[in-house]
Each structure stands twice: as C-alpha cells, then as structure tokens.
Amino acid sequence: MEINGTVIEDTFSEAFTGRCVRATITARDMETVRRAAYDSTATPGAVIGRVEGGVESFHSADETPDGRPGATVQFYYALPDLEKFQVELSYRIRQDILVKPFTALYNSTPDPEGYMDMMKHVGHCGDGYEWIEEFGGREMINIPIAVPDFKIESKMGYRDAIMGANFWYMCRDPETVLEAGRAAINAIGEVEGVVTPFDICSAASKPETNYPWIGPTTNHPYCPSLRDLLGDKSKVPEGVGYIPEIVINGLSLEALEEAMRAGIETVCRYDGVLMVSAGNYDGKLGDHRIDLHGVL
C-alpha cells in the first residue's frame, strides 16, 4: 500500500491493556494550566514500571467544572497493582500540579470501573488541616497551602484503557522528522480520548537486552548509524536516515485506530517520509493488534 508515494508496510502495532485516570486541571490562567499539564505528564514511564501520561486537550473557561481555563490529562499504569498506581499518581499530582498557584484537579474519567481515594496520598499533604467541601455536586478535598488553596476531587475514577499503539515514519532528512511529526501530533490531538506520551520519540526500544538492569534498550536493527556495522542484519531501508516513532495511548481501541489513521495520513503528506511501519513483538506480548492497512 502507498499513500502519496509513501510505502505503508503490511504490519501491525502491538498494544497493551493498562489502567487510566483521566482528570481535568484548572487554574487562574492558561500559562499555569499548561505548565501543570505538561510537567505532570512529562516523563513516559510505563516501560520502567512507573506512571506515564499525556495532555489530551486544553479548554476555555466555559468548558471546565469551575469556570476557569483548563486541560484534560490522562495518566496510565501498565501493572495491575492499584495501590502502586495511586502512589505513583500522587507524585505527579503533588509535585507538578499542587505546587502550581491556584490549581485544582477534577475527575473526568468516563465510565469508570472504580475510584481512587485521593485523601491518603494527596489530601493528607494538608497535615490534618485539610477538609472536605462540596462544589458543583462534587466532593472536594481542600488542602491549605501558602498560596490558598489546592482543591482536588476526593475520588478519581480509573478504567481499563490501551497503551503503546505506535507507528514509525521513516524519513530522508532531519527537517521531515520534526515537521511531519509535529503535524501528526497536532492531528492526533484532534481525536478525543487519546494522548501521545512521548511526543516525537527518537528512541524505539526492544525487550531483549544485554543489560537487564537497564530495561528495554535500543532497537539496534533500526538504528541508521549502525547500518554499516550490522550489514545484512540492519533493517533500515535504503535512503532512510531517521526512524522516529509516535506512541499513542487511548481510552478505547476505536479512538486509537482513529488516531493512528490521522497520524499516518498526516505524515504521508511530506515528501521526506519514505515509509511507515510499526513496532510489535510478533503478537506475543500485546493484548491488541492494530493493522496499519486495516486502519487506513
């Protein structure tokens, strides 16, 4: 298959079931919202057993629970330990959102399968001086801080979601890496319910490693700088100098497929994109398979 002269490899992306908390951050101004949203989702950590997240969308004041500018963010955890998820999530909230002036955090998880109680790992930052109050039909924890005050909904919903859908766009030149990638990120951002936790990712990985304590290491057959060293074992196509990846997490398979389609169709508008492929583990590890030809 080709789109605008770009070859779409007949392969698939492998994705995994994880748990997701979707929340809405608000603040007095959009600059603070952006800082809180990007800081709290800045480190993709699923492959090392930590929380990862992404910014789904930004909102005007008339679209949020408290009539202030806001952002919807998603936080994912790949392991079944719900208590560990709560602890990891609390680090993001306490260190990246609570510390920003005039912020609040609201539950926005659709159709939650359960709820996390925010008092134990976040509310008690008030050291016993925190209190519960009602706001707009929501039960909020008010945490007294030096710039009064941080408010967080007492229960945050979580649900099963899908992590790790991806596609690679193989480029001829560095300009295309950034231009096509940024355009694809913007196109994916128009799809409700998905995030791109790595933005443009320059380091595809593999599960096999010579150094187990590192975790996933570089996917060496796809490193252009190793083409000559690897010889026939290199999988970098002729003319390709760069293989960036875009990883997508989403609340549903349907949303992920729509996002994959939007991203792939966008990168194929650029002459410097020679081929589109995807990362997988031969279908042995992931719960979900997204065929590239099937979504286009």
Swiss-Prot record:
The keyword S-adenosyl-L-methionine does not apply. Pfam families: FTR, FTR_C. InterPro entries: ForMFR_H4MPT_ForTrfase, ForMFR_H4MPT_ForTrfase_C, ForMFR_H4MPT_ForTrfase_fd-like, ForMFR_H4MPT_ForTrfase_N. It comes from the Archaea. Keywords: Transferase. The keyword Protein transport does not apply. One of its GO terms (biological process) is one-carbon metabolic process. One of its GO terms (molecular function) is formylmethanofuran-tetrahydromethanopterin N-formyltransferase activity. SUPFAM superfamilies: Formylmethanofuran:tetrahydromethanopterin formyltransferase. Belongs to the FTR family. This is Formylmethanofuran--tetrahydromethanopterin formyltransferase-like protein. The lineage of its organism: Archaea, Methanobacteriati, Methanobacteriota, Methanomada group, Methanobacteria.
